[in-house]
């Protein structure tokens, strides 16, 4: 069939369907005939990009489809049962065709689709056999269109159409054919920064829905299903937006809700390996702000003789989450630059000192004794994570090396070059950190040598770092061991 003849047959069918749907002048036989013709067009449009491009070459077809969308399910809906069913089926066919075509070319606005969906909801009972089938197509239509356009200022319309309709949301939640494209639609819409800004500043309904769905999903499973993956992609966009920090401040940091959100934040932050600098800066804003808050609270509780164990547990949970996020993002140079700019090393050393002095080291020898001590504070894993963060800040930075010595952080890290069951791997992390602190820094090396001379540094710990103390001309000096020299060759 020639291209012109092909288009002509499609436009003739579309106009005929328009007449049936909008003018209510046809009989049952006309409806059936149009259904058959429309079905063939829908089938062809789902299989061939070339076919879709050909029938979209003339603006006439999109205009007809948009007119049908804008005027259907209003006053022209037939009341006779058979005709009503055929009306819905014809409309579903038009939606299927529009769904297929919109991935090739945008010819309709989101508002037209959402408005048509609302009219459909008002006119068609949920018990109708074609209700769910048609609703699926509406949502697929929205999902397809959202792939090629990031239309702005539609958050309020989405909330009005979907989230204020509890019955509709219940149907979506219990039907994978709806739930999947709906999640894809929201993910695509929230890829637009302006829409995200709307969600985070004006109406956070979509954000809270995403959090609720993530709570139900098994996002810790390595083999994520497609729905969970879509939710994670959506939340990645959210937490990496510059306004998320302000939204998070609206949540009481002492609430269970805050802790629940922070757990999700941790999973999402640590699940991605290719954050860009803009995203990193946005995330570090809320991570570091909250780290400062929980660091101060932690120090206050640990230094107090009277405290609430439940509060300590809650604060500890949130602090671990924030330190884990900083540790994971430490692989990015932008993170290092951010933390250096905000002088994070001072707070890290301050917190490390308080935890080190307030919480007893746990070993095989004293484990039972510590556990039996009533009211003994436990704050596991914190020191290990702090030292890991310090290590990546120190690495290759003479300025941070100097600050660590001046702020007496160097001896703190040295004091942790030993096994502590409260902090798995702290010995290994501390040894790496000390290596970075001593690398090409004579003042730090001399400082450690002087400490060793006063017998305040463990010889074995120094050897593991790759250094040993020697006396030269009556002066105590730190030198690399032969093994360390060989490793560097």
Curated annotation (Swiss-Prot):
Key word Cell cycle present: yes
GO biological process, one term: cell division
A GO cellular-component term linked to this record: cytosol
Principal cellular location given in the protein's record: cytoplasm
Sorted UniProt keywords: Cell cycle, Cell division, Cytoplasm
Protein localization: Cytoplasm
Keyword Metal-binding: no
Assigned protein family: Belongs to the ataxin-10 family.
Function (record text): May play a role in the regulation of cytokinesis.
Protein's name according to its UniProt entry: Ataxin-10 homolog
Organism: Debaryomyces hansenii (strain ATCC 36239 / CBS 767 / BCRC 21394 / JCM 1990 / NBRC 0083 / IGC 2968) (Yeast)
